[in-house]
UniProtKB/Swiss-Prot annotation:
TM annotation in the entry: 28-48, 52-72, 100-120, 122-142, 149-169, 176-196, 220-240, 241-261, 282-302
Membership in a protein family: Belongs to the UbiA prenyltransferase family. Protoheme IX farnesyltransferase subfamily.
Enzyme nomenclature, EC number: 2.5.1.141
Protein name: Protoheme IX farnesyltransferase
Catalytic activity: heme b + (2E,6E)-farnesyl diphosphate + H2O = Fe(II)-heme o + diphosphate
GO cellular component, one term: plasma membrane
Enzyme class: transferase
Length: 304
């Protein structure tokens, strides 16, 4: 049934635009693009050229959205079974398979063009490889096959800082890979916290998520261990000399905060605590990368 709001042409267009936007998972895309932009700024001692910042950032945004649209398409039947995702237009059938494919192709093509014109071909192909890694390797091959899907497939989700760095420098040095490693090690504890408090949903989906295949306590142990590995990874920018004491202090404080969540969950789990830990993990990554940016321009390293 068409509601009064959607019966008006303008209302229908707005509603349809929101539905298409939902396919791109805007909140996840925003975090990815934020990390990519931080990578851009870290790649240069000065200001990022505006054409790269805007054109390159938009290109990465569009290709990320294209990958998420394919993810929604592939998982539409699974999403329909889960309370968290049943509202997605791909799951409800409001946007068809053909429409989703065309939408993804348009976003992907536009993103490739923007990166070619405003950044460089290295960034274009790296971003396209990231698109394939998420949309094909992770979504189609790994996610339904192994409870370690988020670990093995996490590289594609960790690539944005390297993409941003490449857009400015036309190179991906060790410093960029340190940023990738941070997100790579952050992803498992971030996602498994969600999988724990949504495990009833995932049990209905049939996906082999770690809390379903190995149980709550094993998952909590893995969250704790990966948190420790993540904290170690966050120290690499300081050890390597790319960041100073402002970043180090931020990384240690934020890491201790993250570890407190992981340890408390391990000792006394509750779904409410896991939900808070999941939400904090997003704030954690945002603040950590913001600290990298601040430190980059106001680096404090005491003279020895």
């Amino acid at each position: 049934m068409v509601t009064a709001t959607h019966s008006h042409p303008v209302g229908r267009v707005r509603h349809l635009a929101r539905q298409y936007a939902a396919l791109t998972k805007p909140r996840v895309t925003q975090l990815a693009v934020f990390c990519a932009i931080i990578g851009m700024f870290l790649a240069t001692p000065g200001m990022v050229p505006w054409r790269v910042l805007i054109g390159g950032g938009a290109g990465i945004w569009l290709l990320a959205g294209a990958a998420f649209a394919i993810n929604c398409l592939v998982e539409q039947k699974i999403d329909a079974l889960m309370r968290r995702t049943a509202w997605r237009p791909s799951a409800t059938g409001e946007i068809t398979t053909t429409q989703t494919l065309i939408f993804s192709a348009v976003l992907g093509g536009a993103g490739m063009w923007l990166l070619h014109v405003f950044a460089n071909d290295l960034t274009m192909w790296l971003t396209f490889a990231t698109f394939l890694g998420y949309a094909v390797v992770y979504t189609i091959l790994l996610k339904p096959a192994t409870p370690q899907n988020i670990v093995i497939g996490g590289l594609s989700g960790a690539m944005p800082p390297a993409l941003g760095w490449a857009a400015v420098a036309n190179d991906v040095p060790a410093e960029a890979w340190f940023l990738v490693l941070i997100i790579f090690t952050w992803t498992p504890p971030h996602f498994w916290a969600l999988a724990l408090y949504r495990r009833a949903d995932y049990a209905k989906s049939g996906l082999p998520m770690l809390p379903i295949t190995h149980g709550e306590k094993y998952t909590l142990l893995n969250i704790l261990l990966y948190t420790l590995v993540m904290i170690a990874a966050t120290l690499l920018p300081f050890v390597y000399g790319m960041s100073g004491y402002i970043y180090l202090a931020s990384a240690l404080v934020l890491g201790a905060w993250f570890l407190k969540y992981s340890w408390t969950m391990y000792r006394n789990y509750s779904d409410q605590l896991a939900q808070r830990a999941f939400r904090f993990s997003i704030l954690y990554l945002s603040l950590l990368f913001a600290a990298l940016l601040i430190d980059h321009y106001f680096k404090f390293v005491p003279q020895i």
